[in-house]
Curated annotation (Swiss-Prot):
Biological-process GO terms, alphabetical: cell division; establishment of mitotic spindle orientation; microtubule sliding; nuclear migration along microtubule
InterPro entries, sorted: Dynein_regulator_LIS1 (IPR017252), G-protein_beta_WD-40_rep (IPR020472), LIS1_N (IPR037190), WD40/YVTN_repeat-like_dom_sf (IPR015943), WD40_repeat_dom_sf (IPR036322), WD40_rpt (IPR001680)
SMART domains membership: WD40
SUPFAM superfamilies, sorted: Lissencephaly-1 protein (Lis-1, PAF-AH alpha) N-terminal domain, WD40 repeat-like
Name under which the protein is recorded: Nuclear distribution protein PAC1
GO MF, one example: identical protein binding
Family named by the database record: Belongs to the WD repeat LIS1/nudF family.
GO CC annotation terms, alphabetical: cytoplasmic microtubule; microtubule associated complex; nucleus; spindle pole
Quaternary structure (record): Self-associates. Interacts with NDL1 and dynein.
Entries under Pfam families matching the protein: WD40
Keywords: Cell cycle, Cell division, Coiled coil, Cytoplasm, Cytoskeleton, Microtubule, Mitosis, Repeat, Transport, WD repeat
Top-level division of the source organism's lineage: Eukaryota
């Protein structure tokens, strides 16, 4: 009774009295009622003031019984549904054994929807963005030099934040390195480049969730604008390009510079790497292909009217552009040692160009050298549609994604050169960077990785996620 108020106690006592009075009304049990009135300490005034229903308690008991019956029926229905689910699971296992890898339902030529899944506000313009290759994490670099990791599914609080550089971050690369140094199995290495001329490499620990700086080196004499990381055996390699007009290749394990060369006369804005080949684009408006272990320049592409902002190698594994019916299949097979035949470039002339790379001379046990007959890229497509600088390119299957200072993201069909979709209401300012899973990444992690995500960052301090 201690949990009831005085008013509730009085109401309960009166209800009990009224109920007993109703039960014994034909039995002449006035003595019982008098005793009950005395035990419950009910006076005549309380009874006269209480005009409650004598059937209140029976009604409540009836309600409880009906509620219990409903609960019992729901429990029986849940048991039946669980049994049905178990039976269906057993039937599926008889068709597809547990150890069979079911093909991913991810569509490599997926087109992101028009609506935004999430918008993440940052404290300064977003200058670089990168998806984790297998986890639902996006890494964001800002104009103030901060590196931030967000959980795509729960982005309200960052997973990790660090002040990586004293100036703006220009690029982010993420690699799951295996047998790297002191890490026994694998670890996530996050590398950043910056206008402060440094390259930093972080271990994003799955145990602590922190971004731990493990390598830092003064890479160039000026802004480091672009980078690519990859693993060869137990070595993690990193190629970087700079405003000092050089491209360098580093071994992250010991921070040693393995190669340095100057493919351009001006700022090397962007690079892409596939095995031993580096594609570079510059403020001199040209592209160049270099065999980086030897430093041999192999070919050059000219055709843009203004500086190049981004270059991209199109590997055979990532797109069917090289096996389209109108392509020369015999000639295509000759490019097998390179593993690519086409590349893309985006420039300040508002265009994107698709290039066919000339085949260099390939000799056994020798470094490739330029062809004696052709050292010039052939422009096979010019993609027009943006109305301002094209800032970034990403490839997924036969689709090429681009972003621009015109505040739009576009998707292009590499087989036809047509723009298949434009996102014009995602951002309200210059779009600096985008990222999306490439086909090779999807195949590598299939079937565990089944995601269709596009991320982008702009000058309005926002990261947008479309999925």
């Amino acid at each position: 009774m201690s949990s009831l108020t005085d008013s509730q106690v009085n109401d309960l006592h009166c209800s009990i009295y009224r109920y007993v009075q109703w039960v014994s009304q034909n039995n002449g049990s006035s003595d019982l009622l008098n005793k009950l009135q005395s035990v419950l300490d009910i006076d005549e005034l309380q009874l006269s003031l209480d005009d409650g229903d004598q059937m209140l308690l029976p009604k409540k008991w009836g309600s409880i019984i009906r509620l219990q019956r409903a609960i019992t029926k729901l429990e029986q229905k849940c048991d039946a549904l669980q049994q049905e689910l178990d039976d269906k699971t057993k039937q599926l296992e008889t068709i597809v054994p547990k150890d069979t890898q079911i093909a991913t339902t991810t569509d490599v030529n997926w087109l992101p929807p028009d609506h935004i899944y999430a918008s993440i506000q940052n404290e300064s313009p977003v200058t670089a963005i990168k998806l984790h290759p297998s986890l639902a994490i996006v890494y964001v670099g800002t104009d103030t030099g901060r590196l931030i990791a967000y959980d795509i599914l729960n982005y309200t609080i960052p997973l990790a934040v660090t002040t990586a550089h004293s100036k703006a971050i220009t690029s982010i690369e993420v690699i799951e390195a295996h047998n790297f140094e002191e890490f026994i199995d694998s670890t996530t290495l996050v590398s950043t480049t910056s206008k402060d001329a440094q390259i930093n490499v972080y271990d994003h620990s799955s145990n602590t969730g922190e971004l731990k700086l493990i390598r830092s080196f003064n890479a160039h004499d000026s802004t480091v604008s672009s980078q690519k990381t990859w693993q060869k055996d137990n070595d993690v390699l990193l190629a970087s390009s700079s405003r000092d007009a050089t491209v360098k290749v580093w071994r992250v394990n010991d921070s040693r510079c393995l190669q340095s060369f100057s493919p351009h006369s001006e700022w090397v804005k962007s690079i892409d790497v596939l095995d031993e080949y580096i594609l570079s684009g510059s403020l001199d408006s040209t592209l160049r292909l270099t065999h980086w272990p030897s430093g041999n320049g192999l070919s050059v592409g000219t055709g843009h009217e203004f500086p190049i902002e981004r270059v991209l190698i199109i590997p055979f594994s990532d797109s069917k552009i090289c096996t389209s019916p109108y392509r020369d299949q015999n000639e295509h097979s000759a490019f097998a040692p390179l593993r690519f035949k086409y590349c893309a470039s985006a420039a300040r002339d508002n265009t994107i160009k698709i290039w066919e790379v000339p085949l260099p001379q390939l000799k056994p046990n020798s470094a490739p050298v330029p062809s004696t007959t052709n050292t010039t890229f052939k422009c096979v497509m010019t993609l027009r549609g943006h109305t301002s600088w094209v800032k970034d390119l990403k490839l997924r299957g036969d689709h090429l994604f681009s972003c621009s200072d015109d505040e739009t993201i576009k998707c292009w069909d590499l087989n036809t050169g047509n723009c298949v979709k434009t996102w014009s209401s995602i951002h309200n300012n210059f779009i600096n960077c985008i990222d999306i899973d490439r086909e090779a990444t999807i195949e590598q992690f299939s079937p565990s990785l089944q995601r269709e995500i596009l991320v982008s960052g702009d000058m309005d301090n926002k990261v947008k996620i479309i999925r």
